[in-house]
Amino acid sequence: MSSIKITFPDNSVKEFDAGVTTAEIAKSISISLAKKAVAGKVDGNFVDLNQPLKEDGSIEIITKDSNDGLVVLWRTAAQVLANALHELYPNMKFGMGDVTEHGFYFDTDNSESQVAETDFEKISQKMSEIIKANLPIERVEFSEEEALNLVSGDEYQEELVRDVANKNNGRVVAYKQGDFIDITDGVVLSSTGEVKIFKLLSVAGAYWKGASSNPMLQRIYGTAFYKQKDLDAELQRQKEARERDHRVIGNELDLFFVDPKVGAGLPYWMPNGATIRRVIERYIIDKEVAWGFQHVYTPVLANLNLYKQSGHWDHYREDMFPPMDMGDGEMLELRPMNCPSHIQVYNHHKRSYRELPLRIAELGMMHRYEKSGALTGLSRVREMTLNDGHDFIEPDHIEDEIKTLIKLMTEVYNDFDITDYRFRLSYRDPKNTEKYFDDDEMWEKSQSKLKAAMDDMGLEYFEAEGEAAFYGPKIDVQTKTALGGEETLSTIQLDFLLPERFDLKYIGADGEEHRPVMVHRGIVSTMERFTAYLTEMYKGAFPTWLAPHQVDIIPVKNDLHMDYVNDLSSKLRAHGIRVTVDDRNEKMGYKIRQAQVNKIPYTLVIGDEEVSNGTVTVRKYGEEKTNTMTKAEFKNLLFEDIENYSREK
């Protein structure tokens, strides 16, 4: 029998008989590894434990205690779910199953009746029966014709078979457990009995293949773990996530809403939400002006030719709204980006090196055609206002400008008490270069400049291929969300392309024309996404300087204490404090509880003693104790809180 060479993560090499499996390789290393092994990765591709290996390659043994080990478990649990549904609902049709960040799902279409969460008990019971039966899970291959015969009558599975066969030269990979066959090449465990701890979570709608033009299917979500304590921790995390969900808090605090009569992804900002947004906007404008940015206003509409020249029409068209034909040959486009507009600002005057760096900024409204299935509250919308800026600089000032922008970003993060983030250097995908501007020298030069700036500042970062913009590499700041995910909040992008496409120039110290470099930067993303992020981070309890209502004043008796309350509220409002007066005919305890429910930072109670002594009784949000102090003392406390961005000294 012929042999193959297997390379291990420590670069050691061993020979095995051709046809050896990952399970056998794991066992050859140690019995304990074999017990923990759930799959393998050969040359970076998943293989199941029993899949014969016929060629030389590098291998990684995937174990239960790894993230990849969880992925294999979740894929298997999704199959067990589909098998259970197949037994319970014989006429059910099946879309696709997959893993999520924290579990799995399977899409289904049941013409007889919709699956509800009340059905989860019987579905879970059937899953437990399949798990207890410990059915072996076998990898099988079919021709396209054979696979189509197996799934005949299920149009979703038929379409899936054709897609898979088209990618795999007419071959279709599937996994079989008992009589159930799942069309997938996603690697799974060796038997159903290895899925011991699972829970079904929710059911929602999802378009087939994510396209709104396709039928709406039911998506059943679940999660699974190898240990009960890990499932318990995940359920606690999800409970916390529900409590922090900005859509839930936004409704409770009346921050925003989306009206289906108006359109998906087009939020209305209610007074409370608008107040938070206004404070953020004023803060960011003042901060950027202090750092040398000049703010502008530019049109939300532009001639389509502007975006053809910039390259957005070629590279970004699917995320843009259709152009508007004005009937006279002019085509107008809702802008998806602000950079071409800021280039027009730069080009409006002849520029000198003495003006550089020229830093243009705007809170610019944009429109992007997000698919309806991707829209989420404020975090994914179709109309958004981006905190955007573009620096036009001399080429030999790149590293200095990058450092300046990173310092600005970290100062802003500090003011908002954002601490859990990391830097990502985002490069183009060298295996898929057609997605990007074709200039290898430019890419190498710009990527090295970003890396040098980060290294010089001593910042830790990780590198990611395929995450660059089409015109250049970037530094992304990946923030940890309160719900356990990660998203890009800030970005700094280096661009040699657009200055060339728009023929940007400046007169250098030598009196000659030179080409500037353009730096795209966004510090706090869009107002929509940043507000969603902060709402979840603060759990709706905004710091005093951001809170829509900063002080709630409650008179004990309206007929005796309102003059004092009105005088106090007027003086606080004169200093820009956002004050509410709760003079409703309700019990005192109820009004105090409502102030806590509304997460108002300071509640003041005014009764006979306070009026007589010129004092206020203060209760801070989240605290049971109260403090009585003079009005001047409270004013100083409040102002210091606001001026210090509510940070503890």
Swiss-Prot record:
Gene Ontology MF terms: ATP binding; catalytic activity, acting on a protein; metal ion binding; threonine-tRNA ligase activity; transferase activity; tRNA binding
A Gene Ontology biological process noted in the UniProt record is: threonyl-tRNA aminoacylation
How is the subunit organization of this protein annotated in UniProt? Homodimer.
Gene Ontology CC terms, in alphabetical order: cytoplasm
Name of the coding gene: thrS
**Family indicated by similarity:** Belongs to the class-II aminoacyl-tRNA synthetase family.
Recorded protein name is Threonine--tRNA ligase
**Which organism was this protein described from?**
Ligilactobacillus salivarius (strain UCC118) (Lactobacillus salivarius)
Summary of the function given for this chain in its UniProt record: Catalyzes the attachment of threonine to tRNA(Thr) in a two-step reaction: L-threonine is first activated by ATP to form Thr-AMP and then transferred to the acceptor end of tRNA(Thr). Also edits incorrectly charged L-seryl-tRNA(Thr).
EC numbers, comma separated: 6.1.1.3
